[in-house]
Amino acid sequence: MLIGALAAAVTAIRLTLHVLAATVWVGGQIVVAGLLPTIRSLGPDAGKAVARALARLQWPAYAVLLLTGVWNVAATRAGQPHTWQVVLGVKIGVVLLAGLAAYVHQRTASRRALAVWGAIAGVASLAALVLGVVLAG
C-alpha cells in the first residue's frame, strides 16, 4: 500500500515537472511571438534584452524536458505497442530539432534568419507538445 502510494507520488512529480517545463518552453515562445510587435516598438535593443531574459528561463526548462523525457520513457516504454514507439521516435527527433532551431535562432544576426529559425523552433515545439499528448493517450 505504501509502495503504491509512493509510486503514484513519484509519477505525479515526474509528470508535473515535465508539463511545467513544457509550459515554460512552448508557452514562452508563444507569448514572445504574440508580444513581438510591442517589443520591437520599445527600441532596437528591446528584442535582444527580452530574448536574453527568456533564455534564462527557457534553456533550464528545455533541460528539464530532456531529463524528464528520458525518465518518462524509462517509466512507461516497456510493453508499449510498435506505433507508440514510432511516435516516440518522431517526438524525440522533433524535440531535438526544436532545441537546435532555438539555439541557431538565438545565435543568428540576420532578421530573416531570426524569423526562419524562430518559426522552425516554434512549430517543432508545438509538434512535440502534440506528440506528447498523443503518447500520453
Region locations from a protein language model:
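Polytopic transmembrane helical bundles with strong interfacial aromatic enrichment
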Residues: 1-137
